[in-house]
């Protein structure tokens, strides 16, 4: 990049940004269906419990898991892997972007719906402004979550108040 030619430099930077986003999208697509052994062997409940324990140990943050309605069924493997990855992404975002120190993952169900709620005590964000930023890393993260949840016919809800934390809710038909 020749810094003397500002216009060409700006074009190259924009190209590199687009290339980086394309690479990120490619990596996410490549890992889309990778299955952790815990998930294939024991199902979503055990896997989420283990995920939260491991991330808590790794990061030093308090990350707790509650199976509020004693859900114990196995789901289709595509549904389980997507719930796992969505939860993993939400926890990682809470740590990476929100500076959260306390994260709670709650799983509950009814006869027709499985719900996973991730609450954090981080700095929160303005949901409407982030959703408009399709080319930023944070905007892309929310977009990928929406795409992944739609893939399993579910819905995602983002509730956040700047300075007060975030709640992400995934509802999946069962």
Named regions from a protein language model:
Residues 1-174:
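Coiled-coil dimerization/phosphotransfer module
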